[in-house]
Regions:
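C-terminal substrate-binding/active-site "lid" region of AdoMet-derived donor-dependent transferases
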Residues: 130-135, 139-218
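SAM cofactor-binding core of SAM-dependent methyltransferases
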Residues: 34-110
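Surface-exposed interaction regions that form or flank ligand-binding interfaces
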Residues: 104-132
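P-loop/Walker A phosphate-binding loop and immediately adjacent motor/lid segment at beta-alpha junctions
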Residues: 11-13, 65-70, 91-99, 161-166, ...
Length: 218
């Protein structure tokens, strides 16, 4: 049953995980990346033993169907998370090590965006939630949902091994470039960038730079 406080609606269109619409009468999530980015993501997914997704959809379906990786996908839109989980079952590609985890950030609107600023006290749980899962240490992270800068900070602060981060929409959204006060992208693939994160301790100045990232909902 959908949470009555969630404001998500599904208009008549095809459900696309990263495309212009998240509504459909027929639920069929696809990877809505441009061709170069799509190929790059698929290649990285096939090589990874464990994947963390911030934002779920076509990439989750691809991971479940085409890889043997452990997958944790964080989703702020409860109705979308439930529909995606049901889709994996219907397609016969659900497995115990593929999890779509709804994160309660309060009421949401389109694309799982926060619906009420008064719920800000929950927002930090979205980037931090997967790092409390016992035994989960992702090799690859796709940042393609909400709170993207905070998600990058969470990887930096919690990763236990070298971790590749794919950050979508980075090149066309200048707000995200604030992270370059702390680290630089290792590669650019169309609108996406790749970061290579190593486990390390950070100094106070770096923490001070990262703190505002947790207040950005983009």
């Amino acid at each position: 049953m959908t949470d009555p406080t969630t404001t998500t609606t599904f208009p008549d269109a095809t459900f696309d995980s990263d495309g212009p619409d998240r509504g459909a009468a027929s639920f069929n999530p696809v990877m809505w990346f441009p061709p170069a980015e799509k190929q790059f993501v698929q290649t990285c997914y096939r090589m990874a033993d464990s994947i963390l997704e911030y934002g779920s959809g076509g990439s989750t379906v691809f991971a479940a169907r085409e890889t043997s990786a452990r997958v944790v996908s964080i989703e702020s839109d409860r109705a979308w998370a439930e529909a995606l989980s049901a889709h994996l079952v219907a397609e016969g590609i659900d497995r115990p090590d593929v999890a779509v985890n709804w994160c309660d950030i309060g009421p949401t609107r389109g694309w799982g965006q926060p619906g009420k600023a008064s719920s800000w006290g929950r927002f930090h749980t979205y980037p931090l939630q997967p790092w409390s899962i016992p035994g989960f240490s992702p090799e690859l992270v796709l940042i393609d949902g909400r709170f993207r800068m905070a998600c990058l900070a969470a990887v930096m602060l919690h990763c236990q091994r070298p971790t590749t981060v794919l950050f979508d929409d980075y090149t066309r959204r200048k707000t995200y470039h604030a992270v370059e006060q702390v680290l630089q992208p290792n590669a650019r693939i169309g609108r996406m960038v790749r970061f290579e994160i190593e486990p390390k301790d950070y100094d106070r100045a770096t923490y001070a730079c990262m703190l505002p990232w947790f207040f950005s909902t983009d």
